[in-house]
Swiss-Prot record:
Keywords: ATP-binding, Chaperone, Nucleotide-binding, Phosphoprotein, Stress response. This is Chaperone protein DnaK. Residues 575-584 have a biased composition (Low complexity). The gene is dnaK. One of its GO terms (molecular function) is ATP binding. Acts as a chaperone. Residues 490-510, 524-555, 575-614 are annotated as: Disordered.
Length: 614
């Protein structure tokens, strides 16, 4: 099988790697650099890509940068009367990388693994695939950047399960992902970030500082001069990189401008501490998504086993220190953060060609899956974005006494009410032995295989009888449908909350009616006729209210019945106490040997009994 190249198609820089033997190797571009700027420029009917395009970004209006931000949208770029889609611009970057790989390998390259941020939706991923196709590449797999980074660090080779935090501060975007690794399986637990924060912002604070200092000294505003701004940008980027290794750097830009008395030069010493002061607000902005990602994954910093840094801006010592302080662990520094994602993509290429074994590539469920339960609610078993294959079981029971069958209504969607979600299928589990409500144990299992085929099984744990349904292509929804359903869930959150509260109220009221009926039966002759009639009246009033739509009436009748239940419980308690005291008076020894928990009624010195009271 021909080579499958790994491509990190970044917002500001891209990188390409290939698997040589067992090791990924980054391929240098013709200029000798290991990364290529994701910049395209049009000049004199010529298309330029990479460093040459970046160098004239400010002075040439036909220069396109950060096109990745627009992938999956209908955004267009107009250049000299011609429109280009984000896919076409990205394809030009990919063609450049493809050409670099072909020059290195000495053969044509037509297969690639391309990485995308973990938060990319289906349309953004599809747009990335389309860009590869335009560039003449068959995109074998689109994989998540944090997964690729974890692969490059060899974390799939560890024996025990691990939770990994991937801190990715690129040129134009920032995101944090939490991954769980085990048995070669990579699962993205959560992702958070800021797509308007990156290395460019760190350059900008230096540029702003240089402009302010120069203006203070010379009364000249360099931000109004395009040529000067291009030189400032290059100098700021270099200074930022220098300060990752040294405590201060000299910025020297002769003939940057001209004043009344001749040429003006910019000479300034920038210390690391001053840079950290300028960038402090940016560094603090990275911490909130870091905390959010851990919160969404249900983890604290102590649960994180490894921290991986991705992106050139993570070389900034203050960034590394902030991550260490927040997570409480030293980040991994074994792999170049600019190259780690491309190297992981190359390893995935090796998985596809069969050169790399024991790594499982996973897809995810685009929407939550569950069943309808009492009150017309959807009870979710498998959450949206769960990696597949997966399996989940939950035990349910009957809603009525002597219920002979249960209907299993399989649903897909994000809304709390069953009627608002998509029906995938229905089936029935029959011949349930007669029993009071709540007694039968019905286990419902959702099983999704690697192809996304859902198998739902309902099993009566008492008789071991089971019934199932197989649903082909559970994710056969258009992107528009998925987007609409998620959007509906957001827009209707308040209305859904009210309906959910109503459903909860009705379920609680229904349970209360059942509880009162059972209590009256259990008490038998121990309840007075007056109390019994009062309870029956209040119970019937609540049942009648449940048949209507007046929520306030249901609430009021439920509270009335709850008070009756409380009064009954108090009387039962008092009767039990009196009976207990009589029994103690008649036979103290029998009382001590009794299994009745009487700790509430007399002082007990024994330590174990004291524990039982707590």
């Amino acid at each position: 099988m021909s080579k499958v190249i790994g491509i990190d198609l970044g917002t500001t820089n891209s990188c390409i790697a290939i698997l040589e033997g067992d090791e990924p190797k980054v391929i240098q571009n013709p200029e000798g650099a290991r990364t290529t700027p994701s910049v395209v420029a049009f000049k004199n009917d010529e298309t330029q890509v990479g460093e040459v395009a970046k160098r004239q970004a400010i002075t040439n209006p036909n220069t396109i940068q950060s096109i990745k931000r627009h992938m999956g949208t209908d955004y267009k770029v107009d250049v000299d009367g011609k429109s280009y889609t984000p896919q076409e611009i990205s394809a030009m970057v990919l063609q450049n990388l493809k050409s670099t790989a072909e020059d290195y390998l000495g053969e044509s390259v037509d297969k690639a693994v391309i990485t995308v941020p973990a938060y990319f939706n289906d349309s953004e991923r599809q747009a990335t695939k389309d860009a590869g196709k335009i560039a003449g590449l068959e995109v074998e797999r689109i994989i998540n950047e944090p997964t690729a980074a974890a692969l490059a660090y060899g974390l799939d080779k560890t024996e025990q399960d691990q939770k990994v935090l991937v801190f990715d501060l690129g040129g134009g975007t920032f995101d944090v992902s939490i991954l769980e690794l085990g048995d070669g399986v990579f699962e993205v637990l959560s992702t958070a970030g800021d797509n308007k924060l990156g290395g460019d912002d760190f350059d900008q604070v230096i540029i702003d500082h240089l402009v302010a200092e120069f203006k203070k000294e010379n009364s000249v505003d360099l931000s109004k001069d395009k040529m000067a701004l291009q030189r400032l940008k290059d100098a700021a980027e270099k200074a930022k990189k220098d300060l990752s290794g040294v405590s201060q750097t000299q910025i020297s830009l002769p003939f940057i401008s001209a004043g009344e008395n001749g040429p003006l030069h910019l000479e300034l010493t920038l210390t690391r501490s001053k840079f950290e002061e300028l960038a402090d607000s940016l560094i603090r902005r990275t911490m909130e998504p870091t905390r959010q990602a851990m919160k969404d994954a249900g983890l604290s910093s102590s649960d994180i086993d490894e921290v991986i840094l991705v992106g050139g801006s993570t070389r900034i010592p203050a960034v590394q220190e902030a991550v260490k302080k927040e997570v409480g662990k030293d980040p991994h520094k074994g792999v170049n953060p600019d190259e780690v994602v491309a190297m992981g993509a190359a390893i995935q290429g090796g998985v596809i060609t069969g050169d790399v074994k024991d790594v499982v590539l996973l897809d995810v469920t685009p929407l939550s899956l569950g069943i309808e339960i009492m009150g017309g609610r959807m009870n979710t078993l498998i959450e949206r974005n769960t990696t597949i294959p997966t399996s989940k079981s939950q035990v349910y029971s009957t809603a009525a006494d002597n219920q002979p069958a249960v209907d299993i209504h399989v649903l897909q969607g994000e809304r709390p009410m069953a009627a608002d979600n998509k029906t995938l299928g229905r089936f029935q589990l029959t011949d349930i032995p007669a029993a009071p409500r709540g007694v039968p144990q019905i286990e419902v299992t959702f099983d999704i295989d690697k192809n996304g085929i859902v198998n739902v099984t309902a099993k009566d744990l008492g008789t071991n009888k089971e019934q199932n349904i197989t649903i082909q292509s559970s994710s056969a929804l258009s992107d528009d449908e998925i987007d609409r359903m998620v959007k509906d869930a957001e827009e209707n959150a308040e209305a859904d909350k009210k309906r959910r509260e109503e459903s909860d109220l009705r379920n609680e009221a229904d349970s209360l009616v059942f509880q009162v009926e059972k209590t009256i039966t259990d008490l038998g002759e121990n309840i007075s006729e007056e109390d019994k009639q009062n309870a029956e009246d209040k119970k019937e009033a609540l049942k009648s209210a449940l048949e209507g739509e007046d929520i306030d009436d249901i609430k009021a009748k439920k509270e009335d019945l709850e008070k009756v239940v409380q009064d009954l419980s108090t009387k039962v308690y008092e009767q039990a106490a009196q009976a207990q005291q009589q029994a103690q008076g008649e036979d103290a020894n029998a009382s001590q040997d009794s299994n009745v928990e009487d700790a509430d009624f007399k002082e007990v010195k024994d330590d174990d009994n004291q524990d039982n009271q707590k």
